Amino acid sequence: MPSTRNIEKHNDSNPTLRALSLSALGIVYGDIGTSPLYTFKTVILLAGGGTPDVTTIMGSASLIIWTLIIIASVKYICFALRIDNDGEGGILALMSLLSLKLKQKPFIIAVGLMGAALIYGDGTITPAISVLSAVEGLEILSPSLKYYVLPIAITILITLFAIQSKGTTTIGKAFGPVMAFWFLTIGILGARGVIQHPFVLAAINPVYGLNFLFSNGATGFFILCGVFLCATGAEALYADLGHFGTAPIRCTWFGLAFPSLIFNYLGQAALVLEGASTEHNIFYMLCPSDFLLPLIILSTVATIIASQAIITGAFSMTRQAMQLGWLPRLRVTQTSSEGYGQIYIGVVNWLLMLATLGLIIGFGSSEKLAAAYGIAVSATMLCTTVLLFIALHKLWKWNIITSGLVAGLFMIVDASFFAANLTKFINGGYIPITLAIIIYSMMYIWHKGYKTIAIKQKEKNITVDSFLDSIQKEGVVRVSKTAVFLTSKEQDIPPTLVWHVKKNHVLQDKVIILNINNLSIPWCKPGDQLQIVETGAGIWHAVANYGFMEQPHIPKLLKKLEAQGYDINIKDITYYIGHETIFVRNARHTLSKYIKILFVFMHRNALPMSNYFHLPPESVFEIGRQIEI
């Protein structure tokens, strides 16, 4: 994964920037780029369907255009991209940045975690509605093919999830060119419609949208549910900042993605103005019949790319949450040596697949799925706006009035969309919200339980001098070996070392007490990753620093010490780690009891520390203890 710090050194004429811009098209814009497949159709259906009048068509198009301008172009491209955590973007990175520098930690963390949990909830729907809406184009090709839509969509998604463990580096190289061709195609198709009915360009005037919104009462409010679908992928513009940097994302948005989307939505509006039927997918009706099948194939590929971006994003966010201590350790597999972002987390992959397939089978069509789509991502955007306001005021040092005016505009827009989407709660919106609440609860319970264990494990600090005196008095034998004792907190002598000497009456002549320190920044500078100090008598104290985007690998880190001339043999190291068995006894309240039981379940199913830190199993010695909570 390229670092933003390096990307920003390139200017617009640099080939690296052009290459990154092309790659960004394949990762960042999949969701927002495939929204034309279902957005305008959904808006017209919410407005009453049938044959809409000019006011409805122009008002709908105007609302879509200005939603893309305010949310995507202004909020995310112009503001959010400028607030990064050492080059990384996204709501968890923003939460970590603010909680590190400011005092309102509980509130910031609560908002950030809820936003992240909502992204998981939304991530189950995006692949389902995207792929389903693309395959539904077959119904226009031949009505008899409608019976094959669901099986084809299910087959595509099962295949997509099944290949994740193999990595997608090879086919991923084609994502950028394919999405570039996709945007050019939808832009040209839309332009054809605009040329045939140029009056539709007047929809760029926001008056059309505002008049339609405020003159139609409840209908104008409900229609915002459909309008919002055009911006559901906007959060990815910020979340993928660390992959590409600010310049490539801005260049591709304003240079290709944004104008192509505008032309396509206007083209669909022009088609409906001419009297096209709204019963079928309006997007496909823009295409000449001879090219319909190639467009269906291209649309399907584009939605697969959009789904891949969602899956990859879920893996990345899960790793961030693990490193920040909000989720238990899970097995992370690096699927490619070419990029650090190429990872696979099996549990996340299969749970996401089951949820996505369940939604497709349960709802059966993109039209029905639209009822469940939008509520979670609109809530996420609301959370981002809250954190954005804090960042403008506290980090940029804007006065509270200026910060309030800017963030207030975004807040009004986001809150309006969220309120409108709440009306879909009983029609399916409860699904992503329920998933988000479950995930948020899991993160809270894990973090709370982990802190409880840390308190229970708190031992009286034993100094190095007193430890050396005790082993000298007891006649402990020193052997010519190297031992590494892993600990999660800084202390002179960890309990595992005391227990080892007490039980075995022997100690290696080279002892490294290694504290694993997870930072609230994405990447640790190479020079700061390992700090080591010799305290005497063959005992070293070391601190291994890892950012929340990094995967700890202790043997690789210790190889650096060996290369620097330290007298250790990496092949002759024994690693000592603690292994806690947690059990619940005599909980005062029923709720407290079940929360503790859930934590114990998560703890028992977490990836063993030795696997997570890539320790060679034949060289690991676990020291167990029981802890009651």
Curated annotation (Swiss-Prot):
Q: Extract one GO cellular component term from the record.
A: plasma membrane
> How does the protein's chain sit in the membrane according to the entry?
Multi-pass membrane protein
Q: Which Pfam families match?
A: K_trans, K_trans_C
Name the UniProt key words of this record, in alphabetical order: Cell inner membrane, Cell membrane, Ion transport, Membrane, Potassium, Potassium transport, Symport, Transmembrane, Transmembrane helix, Transport
**Stated role:** Transport of potassium into the cell. Likely operates as a K(+):H(+) symporter.
Q: Which family does it belong to?
A: Belongs to the HAK/KUP transporter (TC 2.A.72) family.
Protein name (record): Probable potassium transport system protein Kup 3
Q: Which organism is it from?
A: Legionella pneumophila (strain Paris)
Supply the gene name.
Answer: kup3
